[in-house]
Amino acid sequence: MLMQTEIIAQLVLILPEILIALGIMALLLIGVYSGAHSYLTVTGLTIALLFATIILIVLFPKDGFFYTNALIIDAFSRYMKILTLIGALFSLILSVGFSSSQKFDIFEFPILVLLATLGMMLMISSGNMLSLYMGLELQSLALYVLAAIHRDNVKSSEAGIKYFVLGALSSGLLLYGISLLYGFTGQIGFREISSALNGNILHLGVIFGIVFILAGLAFKISAVPFHMWTPDVYEGAPTPITAFFAGAPKIAAMALIIRVIVFAFIPLESSDNFMPAWQQILIFMAISSMALGAFAAIGQTNIKRLMAYSSIGHMGYALVGLAAGNILGVKGILIYMTIYLGMTIGSFAFILGMRFSNRYVENIYDLAGLVKTNPFMAIVMTIQLFSLASIPPMAGFFGKWYTFSAAVRAGLVPLAIVGMVLSVIGAFYYLRIIKIMWFDDAKDSFVILSNEIKLCLCLSALFVLFYVFFGFWFSEFAEKAATSLFQ
């Protein structure tokens, strides 16, 4: 009886994951037997399932360890899971009209999104290297198929192949790093690895293990120098799937990196008063990502490739907070990723809303004179672009404020200064789009917006515009989540 009670208590901890897994199996059956309208039926039920899972996490918070620390359920994991679920939910909402018009409205699409989301939830709660890899691969395999799901489109097929090949390489790097750490410590748990290494001189093999693990994880957030897949996949994949790639997987991967760093690497003492190896790697990736995001996007005219480089830059700014290695830094990342998700949803809703009678907008110069033909869209996107450029009092400004403040508090003043300079440079290409929309001569008018696009645009614009008034609410929850990670 006692054992049964303990098993039930353990299963309650992962109830959201169980709900998603059961939902996937049920939706597969529904999709097969619902005939011609299977796509809309399954998509609607998937959106309802994601919303129900968010409600479950919010109303019934549970803390604990599942199966000897394989999964860790705490305030941090709940916060990041909610963000991930919101990202998946809005991606599906945005996909409805696009999928129908582009003739790939197949019921497997929302189910693959659910499979990827389940993998992300496992990643976020990972407590050891085994659960880390299982969650990561469940997410990755679903994402490879999603990238190439538009089989009649050459660019989509090319994006899927590129993502698969480079993703397999990153998985190999990650596995090799895990094997090195396991070989030198005999442990797979994050905290156990830290305990085994702490106080001892780090062997060269351990340092290589740390490097390979961080390299494999950096691929998932498109951090330089593991960003090569991002522009091509963003451009080639269908736009709603690009919106999904830009949001939920980045949040889950960042959560995983945070947990690995905080549990396994931060407790390690650096020798000879020198900066720890993990911190050197993070600083290099942060500066490189911020620099590439600032300079590479300047020459881009394809709007999805531009958003790809923008995303790389944003991950660099988030890594600034992680390099600080303290509670304030993790809190800054949580706030940054919250704001980043809001801006991403709004930006891709705009891209999906900008459609001519025969095609979607691909070039930023197609937006010329938008304020004259569609003032609502011009105003909403201007708000988003000001936020992406981190111009106060928009939400994007506060995201960078928290991460740079954490870096300064940790003594990484040069890193914060470099970040601020690159942020100013990166604002150029956002302001260029505003100039095109407001001051260039108008082109052809666009088709009427669908209701789901209007909903996403309005919610996102209100979020980034009025964050200054209710941001303290997110700050409070982010602080609780960050604190739970260091306990």
From Swiss-Prot:
It is found in: Cell inner membrane. It comes from the Bacteria. GO terms for biological process: ATP synthesis coupled electron transport. Its EC number is 7.1.1.-. The chain crosses the membrane at residues 12-32, 40-60, 79-99, 104-124, 129-149, 164-184, 201-221, 248-268, 281-301, 310-330, 332-352, 378-398, 411-431, 455-475. The keyword Signal does not apply. GO terms for molecular function: NADH dehydrogenase (ubiquinone) activity; NADH:ubiquinone reductase (non-electrogenic) activity; quinone binding. NDH-1 is composed of 14 different subunits. Subunits NuoA, H, J, K, L, M, N constitute the membrane sector of the complex. This is NADH-quinone oxidoreductase subunit N. It comes from Bartonella bacilliformis (strain ATCC 35685 / KC583 / Herrer 020/F12,63). The gene is nuoN.
